[in-house]
UniProtKB/Swiss-Prot annotation:
Superkingdom: Bacteria
GO cellular component: cytosol
Species this chain originates from: Yersinia pestis
Presence of the UniProt keyword 4Fe-4S in the record: no
SMART domains: tRNA_SAD
Location within or outside the cell: Cytoplasm
HAMAP family linked: Ala_tRNA_synth_B (MF_00036_B)
Pfam family, any one: tRNA-synt_2c
Cofactor note (record): Binds 1 zinc ion per subunit.
Catalytic activity: tRNA(Ala) + L-alanine + ATP = L-alanyl-tRNA(Ala) + AMP + diphosphate
Annotated region described as Catalytic, given as residue ranges: 1-461
The name this protein goes by in its record: Alanine--tRNA ligase
Length: 875
């Protein structure tokens, strides 16, 4: 009996654990150690700094099952997913790694033992082929002489990519740095499938499938191309879990393995699809994996960066669901089946299941509103197409108006053997960006152009006043030697107590002074390693190399400190009350209030808001010390410090601890003790995007001022209802009850008036060809009363056509009622449409009842006069 995908994953990890490897958990899909990577796309990503010698681990051998995404950027498999047997946006990479420990001999023998041993994968040896780099005699000899692979199944691959060391069998991290030859293992599916062995003209066929790549990092490539031997050669291997599962489960497509069979069945169930061979089922089954795990790892659908790639994948899945005939939101329903098939590998996803489902459901509901209209427009454009390429302008219009990512449009075109002018799309996109830049403000932001080579030493953790030297001056974005009174500028100092805006905390304000000049600082920004003081010179002249006294606005700084410390307490309290899925998604900390964005899938309940507020105030009353410590990033994480999603940290980080309640990485300014905050009050809780909530709050003096405002308001209301604060609720309730009673009495009077009006009107009905017709313009009647009057008149007249109108605030309100016995000849909707167009309006409704509005009050009498002839022509 073949192994399940989950059993294969576990067997791989167990095998290498038995060989002395540390089993390391999969890292997040959002790389935190490589800003050049959009998503984690290989098992070695989390060990990159170890291979580069920048990081050390407590182990020299490791094994992982790493979650990977390839969609967007250099490694983009999105357009092929669903159309081939092996492309995925999400996959798991099984890997074993040696950091200067074992090398080629053990790496090759480990791989062969796992693949062929009866105890492990038990693959037929005669089905396995291997490749080595053309000059890697050491690896060749190990395969041939130690392992015993026949020479005809060992293939040397040279530089087949157009340059020295540019080969399928030579791996490089970049233009410089660690690199080396690699050896790939292929499985032969048999001669009933087309394709040739690696290196042959038919190598792109599906007969010979690469299942494992073993990289031997033995060189350090220099900028001049020289290959220097590494002092400690290392090993990095990767084997796609889905590929090896297909081999071990004796199927030719990854989409036929147990994991995908179950997922595809779930997709068919939620979409109502019956053709289980549909490519759309494969697309959706693949996409739910990448989408669910990306959201679980903190990515939220948006229109930029990682969030936009996620949105593209979601919308592609929704469109394929639409093709399958899905009539309602379906994508979010696949999270539960996904968790079931992924087993232990989905433990973190299971913790955040509700949040992931909510984000997916919200995104699908938003896109569903425009999907049908967008597809109709695309169909219309394609029907008019004379060539085989859709123009970029149309593709951009679909993106801009209907939210269609260009690859979704390309998907539709591909199904019809058409192409999209993607270069034209990019031109249209760039034109929009240019228009946005041109209209974004009244003038140029010269400060954004500033580039400063020097660095500023920040002394603001311990000082609010500092003697310093001017190292650079910028006016209108350009470096100058001096500035004069009345000129706006940016001043850079060699050292400063002013905090430059970062981490959500606004920049400081204050003054730079010397004996002859005063510079008013209105903002402080960071320019690389320099800190720039933005403001205006109010007196004198200031030159480069002048000495100044830097004076921070202490009162403002202290308010900011309290608010920043409160955000840390708030973050910890939210995780305590709502759950560990809460993560900071953004913040603003200034001297007036604090704003905190966080991941959560629904609006907070009033009692949850109260609990969070109480918990923060409890920590304030505990008056815990706020302590900072600088340490290595890994040590900080081991200590439990929360790193913020999307932030890039140096190797040395500042850890801020508030007693036993909060530990976070933070470079901002803070209170000395939590008691300094004084008081914390939440102002609002709201949503900003799918799965993102926002809290605004005040502290200290701001919180006390809020209490005073609320107290004053209560006093004012108590005075108005002739009560006091103690019985205010009862007094207000009594006023509301009295108001409701009076409203009911007023409505009864209006109903009586309408009945009386109806009774007097019924006598004015005319007979038109044997049918009763009543047309009347009423004064002093509310528009909403017209419907009640029509119902009354129908009862009184038995069989009739009734047209009533009234005017208010220069607007016309119309209603037409037709008893059901007459709707075969006269339909209320048709009659009211004729009247409405005469008074500058439109309307509609059922055959027996229709309403309309208009704006031309003067035309109403003539419009009503035309009704008799209109009815007569149809009777």
């Amino acid at each position: 009996m073949s192994k399940s995908t989950a059993e294969i994953r576990q067997a791989f990890l167990d095998f290498f654990h038995s060989k002395g490897h540390q089993v390391v958990s999969s890292s997040t899909l959002v790389p935190n150690n490589d800003p050049t990577l959009l998503f984690t796309n290989a098992g070695m990503n989390q060990f990159k700094d170890v291979f580069l010698g920048l990081d050390k681990r407590a182990y020299s051998r490791a094994t992982t099952s790493q979650r990977c995404v390839r969609a967007g950027g250099k490694h983009n498999d999105l357009e092929n997913v669903g159309y081939t047997a092996r492309h995925h946006t999400f996959f798991e990479m099984l890997g074993n790694f040696s950091f200067g420990d074992y090398f080629k001999h053990d790496a090759i023998n480990f791989a062969w033992e796992l693949l062929t041993s009866e105890q492990w994968f038990n693959l037929p040896k005669e089905k396995l082929w291997v490749t080595v780099y053309e000059t890697d005699d050491e690896a060749y000899n190990i395969w041939a002489n130690e392992v015993g692979v026949p020479h005809e199944r060992i293939i040397r691959i040279g530089d087949n990519k157009g340059g020295a060391f540019a080969s399928d069998n030579f791996w490089q991290m970049g233009d410089t740095g660690p690199c080396g030859p690699c050896s790939e293992i292929f499985f032969d599916h048999g001669d009933h499938i087309w394709g040739g062995p690696p290196g042959s003209a038919e190598e792109d066929g599906d007969r010979y499938i690469e299942i494992w790549n073993i990289v031997f990092m033995q060189f350090n490539r220099q900028s001049d191309g020289t290959m220097l031997p590494l002092p400690k050669p290392s090993v990095d291997t990767g084997m796609g879990l889905e590929r090896i599962a297909a081999v071990l489960q004796h199927v030719n497509s990854n989409y036929e393995i147990d994991l995908f069979r179950d997922l595809i069945a779930a997709v068919a169930d939620v979409t109502g699809a019956t053709d289980l061979s549909s490519k759309s089922l494969r697309v959706i089954a693949d996409h739910i994996r990448s989408c669910a795990f990306l959201i679980s790892d903190g990515v939220i659908p948006s229109n930029e960066n990682r969030g936009y790639v996620l949105r593209r994948i979601i919308r592609r899945a929704i469109r394929h669901g639409n093709m399958l005939g899905a009539k309602e939101t379906f994508f979010y329903k696949l999270v539960a089946p996904l968790i079931a098939v992924m087993g232990p590998a989905a433990a973190e996803l299971k913790q955040q299941q509700a949040m992931v489902e909510q984000v997916l459901k919200t995104e699908e509901e938003q896109f569903a509103r425009t999907l049908e209209r967008g597809l109709a427009l695309l169909d219309d454009e394609l029907s008019k197409l004379t060539g085989d390429t859709l123009d970029g302008e149309t593709a951009f219009r679909l993106y801009d108006t209907y939210g269609f990512p260009v690859d979704l449009t390309a998907d539709v075109c591909r199904e019809r053997n058409l192409k999209v002018d993607e270069a034209g799309f990019e031109q249209a996109m760039e034109a929009q960006r240019r228009r946005a830049r041109e209209s974004s403000g009244f003038g140029a932001d010269y400060n954004s152009l500033i580039r400063v080579d020097s660095a500023s030493q920040f002394s603001g953790y311990d000082h609010v006043q500092q003697h310093a030297t001017v190292t650079a001056l910028f006016r209108n974005g350009e470096a100058v030697d001096e500035i004069h009174a009345g000129e706006e500028a940016v001043v850079v100092l060699n050292r400063t107590p002013f905090y430059g805006e970062s981490g959500g905390q606004v920049g400081d304000k204050g003054e730079l002074k010397n004996a002859t000049a005063t510079f008013s600082v209105t903002d402080t920004q960071k320019y690389g390693q320099a800190i720039g003081h933005v403001g205006i010179l109010t007196t004198g002249t200031l030159r480069v190399n002048h000495s100044v006294e830097a004076l921070v606005d202490v009162v403002r700084r202290n308010r900011i400190r309290l608010n920043h410390s409160a955000t840390h307490l708030l973050h910890a309290a939210l995780r305590n009350v709502l759950g560990e899925h809460v993560a900071q998604k953004g913040s603003l900390v200034n001297d007036k209030y604090l704003r905190f964005d966080f991941s959560h899938f629904e609006a907070m309940k009033p009692e949850q808001i109260r609990l969070v507020e109480d918990l923060v105030n409890e920590q304030i009353r505990r008056n815990m010390p706020v302590q900072t410590e600088v340490m290595e990033l890994d040590a900080a994480k081991e200590k439990g410090a929360m790193a913020l999603f999307g932030e890039k940290y140096d190797d040395q980080v500042r850890v801020l601890t508030m007693g036993d309640f909060s530990t976070e990485l933070c470079g901002g300014t803070h209170a000395s003790r939590t008691g300094d905050i004084g008081l914390f009050r939440i102002l609002t809780e709201s949503g900003t995007a799918a799965g993102i909530r926002r809290i605004e709050a005040v502290t200290g003096e701001g919180a006390i001022a809020l209490l005073h405002q609320q107290s004053d308001l209560l006093q004012d209301v108590a005075h108005l209802v002739k009560g006091d604060i103690h019985n205010l609720a009862d007094k207000v309730r009594a006023v509301l009850d009295r108001s409701k009673m009076l409203e009911r009495e007023l409505q009864q009077l209006k109903d009586q008036q309408a009945a009386q009006e109806s009774a007097s009107l019924s006598s004015s009905a005319k007979l038109i060809n044997g049918v009763k017709l009543l047309v009347s313009q009423l004064d002093n009647v509310e528009p909403k009363m017209l419907r009640t009057m029509v119902d009354d008149l129908k009862n009184q007249l038995g069989s009739a056509i009734i047209v009533l109108a009234t005017t208010a605030d220069d607007k016309v309100s119309l209603i037409v009622g037709v008893t059901k016995d007459l709707t075969g000849k006269v339909k209320a909707g048709e009659l009211i449409a004729d009247i409405a167009q005469q008074v500058g309006g439109k309307g509609g409704g059922r055959p027996d009842m229709a309403q309309a509005g208009g704006t031309d009050v003067q035309a109403l009498p003539a419009a009503l006069a035309s009704v008799e002839a209109w009815v007569a022509s149809r009777m």
